[in-house]
Amino acid sequence: MTTTETSLSADTKNGIDFKIADLSLADFGRKELRIAEHEMPGLMSLRREYAEVQPLKGARISGSLHMTVQTAVLIETLTALGAEVRWASCNIFSTQDHAAAAVVVGPHGTPEEPKGVPVFAWKGESLEEYWWCAEQMLTWPDSDKPANMILDDGGDATMLVLRGMQYEKAGVVPPAEEDDSAEWKVFLGLLRSRFETDKGKWTKIAESVKGVTEETTTGVLRLYQFAEAGDLAFPAINVNDSVTKSKFDNKYGTRHSLIDGINRGTDALIGGKKVLICGYGDVGKGCAEAMKGQGARVSVTEIDPINALQAMMEGFDVVTVEDAIGDADIVVTSTGNKDIIMLEHIKAMKDHSILGNIGHFDNEIDMAGLERSGATRTNIKPQVDLWTFGDTGRSIIVLSEGRLLNLGNATGHPSFVMSNSFANQTIAQIELWTKNDEYDNEVYRLPKHLDEKVARIHVEALGGRLTKLTKDQAEYLGVDVEGPYKPDHYRY
């Protein structure tokens, strides 16, 4: 699809509005979804536990999260627990079109008569299309019944509502600056266009929303920034820092999907190659471990001496980008920060070396600088480009245009690890929806006993057998026999 923001319109069938690539892919998507359900014991356990209670009845959840097969299982878990849902992807390349089709058609519908959930997502959206989809996800058919919950990944949905409300109260949407990113210009353009037609839209939504649950590190950072500025208009649960999310999805999911993305994108042998991983947080740890497991010679960049020391204890060299970029065969950014690999670094890379990002946003690699550099871009296949510099003749392989390569070049994290993350998301939605009066407009984390609940489900699914504390042992440790077993400050 190459239409512009102004020419897009939703499709409607059987009372469901949606915009996806191909509704006929639903059968394929449903088959993969059924397989994923067997690999997602956390979500299936929550369906069994809460199906009769319907704890999310009355919730109108606007979800912005990668529209994958695994997310399809999450969406249908939310609806099984009573929620109404509208969905968009949080990345222009991450949608799996057959998964989107399966969700729209639903388990009991057909492409001719869909009975599922409105989805606005397809693989390969433009920036204008992406933000149009985000607005559709937040715009419910009955304006008197707007979204009352947000499920977010990266914070774009939350930002759209909160910035929209902020600008409505100010009476003006600020103009874009010349050096603003292309995406920010599109974002402001959308808000400006909507301000002209509906000056109170975002304020109305913000006042209706009872809470947001946030999936990832960068989105959590945005939440804390909104809270510190006094601009957070509803409670938020930081799902990312649940142990069963950050220590599993971020590390073990990345360990699986990074290799998958590089293999599908390039078919390059990793063993023996020099690899530079920028950032050694939970995601960076998964990246480094994955590359080491393939036989690569791995170096790491870090700003934090504690993380740097951890890397060295694992046998990784800690270097600067400037020191290592010229020798690296593969470079992966995983910092959650901006301006990590700049144009001068890219120009210093070896001929036909591989450059990719696995942080949530596309600002870790200076793609704008690369586009302005005069380098020639040759598309090899979807989300794989060869950039050639005329002055040196050297070429660099860039994956997914600097966006998430594990979702752009592959299919993201495997179902089992996402079952941990999405079980946390579901529990967090239930928590905010059913106990809303217990939360202020601040950022919270799920209590430890719920973290342990998610872990226990998955230990049992893998055939593990947990040791049971005696009453005397529990008293000795100062904990309950049934947990929680660790204080909040325990780092795992």
UniProtKB/Swiss-Prot annotation:
Its cofactor is NAD(+). GO terms for molecular function: adenosylhomocysteinase activity. GO terms for biological process: L-homocysteine biosynthetic process; one-carbon metabolic process; S-adenosylmethionine cycle. This is Adenosylhomocysteinase. It comes from Mycobacterium ulcerans (strain Agy99). It comes from the Bacteria. It is an enzyme of class 3 (hydrolase). GO terms for cellular component: cytosol. NAD(+) binds at residues 216-218, 250, 279-284, 302, 337, 358-360, 406. It catalyses: S-adenosyl-L-homocysteine + H2O = L-homocysteine + adenosine. May play a key role in the regulation of the intracellular concentration of adenosylhomocysteine. Its main location: cytoplasm. Binds 1 NAD(+) per subunit. Pathway: Amino-acid biosynthesis; L-homocysteine biosynthesis; L-homocysteine from S-adenosyl-L-homocysteine: step 1/1. Its EC number is 3.13.2.1. Keywords: Cytoplasm, Hydrolase, NAD, One-carbon metabolism. Substrate binds at residues 68, 153, 215, 245, 249. It is found in: Cytoplasm. Belongs to the adenosylhomocysteinase family.
